[in-house]
Amino acid sequence: MPSHSRSRDRYRGERDPSRRYREVYDDDDDDDFDYHPRERRRYRRDDYQHDIRSHESPNYNDDLNEYDAAAEDPAVPLRSHDVEGRRRERSRAGESPIASPSRRDRNRGGEEYRRHGTYGDGGSPTRAMRDRRHRSRDGQRARPRDMDREARRQRRRERARGAAAMKHKSSDSTNSGSHLLSADALAKLRSHYDEEDQRERSQEQEQPRLESKRQRKRPIVGDEPQALAPFPDETPRGQSKGRIVSGAYLEEGHPEMEVRHRGGGGPAMEARWRKEGNWDGTMEGSDAQPPFWKRKKWWIVIGVLVVVLAIVIPVAVVMSKKHGHDDDKSGSSSSVDNSDSPYISSLDGLSHDSIPESAQGSILDPWTWYDTRDFNLTFTNETVGGLPIMGLNSTWDDSTRPNDNVPPLNESFPYGSQPIRGVNLGGWLSIEPFIVPSLFENYSSKDRIIDEYTLCKKLGSSAASTIEKHYADFISEQDFIDMRDAGLDHVRIQFSYWAVTTYDDDPYVAKISWRYLLRAIEYCRKYGLRVNLDPHGIPGSQNGWNHSGREGVIGWLNGTDGQLNRQRSLDFHNQISQFFAQPRYKNVVTIYGLVNEPLMLSLPVEDVLNWTTDATKLVQKNGISAYVTVHDGFLNLSKWKQMLKDRPDRMFLDTHQYTIFNTGQIVLNHTDRVKLICNDWYNMIKEINTTSAGWGPTICGEWSQADTDCAQYLNNVGRGTRWEGTFAIGDSTVYCPTADTGPTCSCASANAPPADYSDGYKKFLQTYAEAQMSAFGTAQGWFYWTWHTESAAQWSYKTAWKNGYMPKKAYAPDFKCGDDIPSFGDLPEYY
């Protein structure tokens, strides 16, 4: 849980200690301002607080940093400050209809309508156009026949009328009255001609219908396959260059994309599917369905998919459950699992009906859990201190021990005469970016995802599933087996107040981590490991660092809600102390932490001490018999000789020691670094642990063998390193052993995989770690920070232990202070 100021000796050995203090706590440009990487633009970061001790957070106007993208993106129009120019442009647009965008769109739409109404996409005439052309040609062929027919008809009428007239006028015998046609005969003749005319007109009217029938019987496509002609490289002159489809067109009601039918497209504005089996060539029947053979094909495809899924899904479920069962037997690795399969095989054979309907879907419902391994799944809504016991077994065994050097759990641990040898579970239930960078590295720097608060807020509704998967995968039962096998005997478990409750608009995932904490304690019991409870984040944040949950202002005992959060933190301890005062935890939870690293360099010291006294009395009143720890607050340990003299009994002072956050210590070479531990730290810890010359029983709750600050996100997300001179913006000072003499220090070696470490470097790392074990062993003992990391090899006890630069057994180191410092071979000092 390191931060950029975690060592109590942070200011000792500085070239200018006062400058360094001002840099961090007064008006540090590193914290106040960031710079644009390309433009070197200076701006205040979001959520920046001018003074960590201030009660209010000023807001800044983002308009000062308004960014105009036109210079970089030609698609973004430049802003014009020429008002007259813009007025002239608008007037020209109004005078010329072609210059008007909307008019251009309408013209383009009309032109495209005429074009699409005549020609298809391939440049060939549409069906409607061909029909019109056929009818035109047929009409042209029929026109001469009609004219001849009408001429013959007219001549017959004239001959008939002339003959009748001659017969009436003639006096010849042949034309006498006895031979004249009667009126009836003339009427019959006239009727005959009329019937002939009617038949001809009927034939003319029938001709278009017959022609349409002949067209329906024509083949739609020929024997040879046809392809659409490609679009021309250049638009023909006079033809509009309209888009195929345009968002503006659609918004203004222009035609949709044409739905093509085989043989050519329908007219523009037409988007109807034709039923291919019985289309009669008309535009009616807009409700026609797709052809039967197409519907049948899709039904076949859907049926095949259903059958495949019916086979695949059960097989996948069975394999997933088998995988989870195998993990239970062998103990899965605690490395991050990239699969999304939950560990729920223990639900097999159980009925969801065993969970009361009122509790189904709640935090007490195992069917909502991502991981059910080693939980008691028998439902109970019983609580202690308002906290659920769901998942716990009703019996337990405290006869176990991790090794023969340690008494079993049901016997007292000899604190003071035998040192604690423990590890932390950092980054697990209280997330820290440098331990689990995979949760943070996929976001842009603009998102400002820098801690668990901003991460959960960004994840939104998926926060619970994402965070619980991390809980289930990051630490498993196998880790506790490995801790035992490494010779360790204590585990300091980090958790935060949102394991119990959340307040106001907290985005944290509430209450899920509680059951993982309880299961971890049961794993510790199983392998004889004693537990140190460590509340890492309390309401309001006790230090404003990312590992408290939220980076920024300290809101605990400080600011507008300082007293409110003081009470909330006491309420938190009231609940968890009642819970862990149960008899089942008496032998396994032997150290009880109050709050991790309150920043007493910024908080009123008396307020912190008064709260510490109140909290200790509260938890002891509730039945806690474990040792209660108070952190040194980063004050010089010598000051604690006079502090909390009238404290309650059974308390430990907790100090955290690192060399890499102090610029006077990070520059030490390998040998001098070991000397610092065995000379200065050894005597300092030994003295503070005594009641006569120091404070009393003291533990070192955090330390590591890291000799650089190179790990990703170690100094906060987006922050550089002291080792390479990138830690402070505007200050490129390099803090490493060869900074003045060369060669240049690089993080490449420190961040390399452990398999690439040289034998000399591994020897140094192990000696460096064992020297600290020796120094802290002069007091109550130590807890290494931390057990497991995703990639920071120098911060993972497990990685060091498995790769040969940590003692095989923590209780049997190869080096102790007082021994000759071994040679590290040709190990370069910049390594």
UniProtKB/Swiss-Prot annotation:
Give glycosylation sites per the record. Answer: 376, 381, 393, 410, 442, 546, 558, 610, 636, 669, 689
Q: What class of enzyme is it?
A: hydrolase
Output compositional bias ranges, type Basic and acidic residues: 1-24, 44-56, 79-93, 102-115, 137-151, 198-213
Gene Ontology cellular component list: cell surface; extracellular region; plasma membrane
What Pfam families does the annotation carry?
A: Cellulase (PF00150)
Give an example GO biological process: cell wall organization
Which region ranges are annotated with the description Disordered?
Answer: 1-179, 192-241
Residue intervals annotated with topology Cytoplasmic: 1-297
What EC numbers are recorded for this enzyme? 3.2.1.58
User: Which InterPro entries does the UniProt record give?
Assistant: Glyco_hydro_5, Glycoside_hydrolase_SF, Glycosyl_hydrolase_5
| Membrane-topology annotation of the record | Single-pass type II membrane protein
Annotated compartments? Cell membrane
Q: Which GO terms describe its molecular function?
A: glucan exo-1,3-beta-glucosidase activity
Which residues are on the Extracellular side of the membrane?
319-831
- Reaction equation(s) it catalyzes: Successive hydrolysis of beta-D-glucose units from the non-reducing ends of (1->3)-beta-D-glucans, releasing alpha-glucose
Q: Which of UniProt's keywords are assigned here? A: Carbohydrate metabolism, Cell membrane, Cell wall biogenesis/degradation, Glycoprotein, Glycosidase, Hydrolase, Membrane, Polysaccharide degradation, Signal-anchor, Transmembrane, Transmembrane helix
Q: Where is the active site?
A: 597 (proton donor), 702 (nucleophile)
The transmembrane segments are: 298-318
- Superkingdom, natural source: Eukaryota
Regarding protein family, the annotation reads:
Belongs to the glycosyl hydrolase 5 (cellulase A) family.
Q: What does this protein do?
A: Glucosidase involved in the degradation of cellulosic biomass. Active on lichenan.
Please give the name of this protein: Probable glucan 1,3-beta-glucosidase D
Which organism is this entry from? Aspergillus flavus (strain ATCC 200026 / FGSC A1120 / IAM 13836 / NRRL 3357 / JCM 12722 / SRRC 167)
Taxonomic lineage of this organism?
Answer: Eukaryota, Fungi, Dikarya, Ascomycota, Pezizomycotina
